[in-house]
Curated annotation (Swiss-Prot):
<feature type="topological domain" description="Vesicular">
    <location>
        <position position="142"/>
    </location>
</feature>
<feature type="compositionally biased region" description="Polar residues">
    <location>
        <begin position="26"/>
        <end position="36"/>
    </location>
</feature>
<dbReference type="GO" id="GO:0048280">
    <property type="term" value="P:vesicle fusion with Golgi apparatus"/>
</dbReference>
<keyword id="KW-1133">Transmembrane helix</keyword>
<keyword id="KW-0931">ER-Golgi transport</keyword>
<comment type="similarity">
    <text>Belongs to the BET1 family.</text>
</comment>
<dbReference type="InterPro" id="IPR039899">
    <property type="entry name" value="BET1_SNARE"/>
</dbReference>
<comment type="function">
    <text>SNARE required for targeting and fusion of ER-derived transport vesicles with the Golgi complex.</text>
</comment>
<keyword id="KW-0256">Endoplasmic reticulum</keyword>
<keyword id="KW-0472">Membrane</keyword>
<dbReference type="GO" id="GO:0006886">
    <property type="term" value="P:intracellular protein transport"/>
</dbReference>
<keyword id="KW-0653">Protein transport</keyword>
<comment type="subunit">
    <text>Component of a SNARE complex consisting of SED5, BOS1, BET1 and SEC22 or YKT6. Interacts with SEC24.</text>
</comment>
<feature type="domain" description="t-SNARE coiled-coil homology">
    <location>
        <begin position="52"/>
        <end position="114"/>
    </location>
</feature>
<feature type="region of interest" description="Disordered">
    <location>
        <begin position="1"/>
        <end position="36"/>
    </location>
</feature>
<protein>
    <recommendedName>
        <fullName>Protein transport protein BET1</fullName>
    </recommendedName>
</protein>
<feature type="topological domain" description="Cytoplasmic">
    <location>
        <begin position="1"/>
        <end position="117"/>
    </location>
</feature>
Amino acid sequence: MSSRFAGGNAYQRDTGRTQLFGPADGSNSLDDNVSSALGSTDKLDYSQSTLASLESQSEEQMGAMGQRIKALKSLSLKMGDEIRGSNQTIDQLGDTFHNTSVKLKRTFGNMMEMARRSGISIKTWLIIFFMVGVLFFWVWIT
């Protein structure tokens, strides 16, 4: 190791090294042991029974996948119908709330107009309604 860094050039790159992750001596030992399945010279010979077996397995798996796809399609169609129905229900509920709001505003306006025309203040009307409420509550609990 001391001979490698001799002469004070420890900061310089080793000129014999050409690969980042290869050995330091420059040999290409990784390529010697690598074998490829595509580059092999062994001939693979499948018999007709093996090929038929593989094909039948493939057809079975394709059939099962087809059934699963049909089930998913059916499920997604049912989900779409449910979502559309829910959206219609929500729209109807919104319309109902709007109509109720309009009716309550109109009723409150009519009540305020009635109170103004009668000459009795709103405080008096509130006291009367409170007394009637207390009377109903008293009858309810006894």
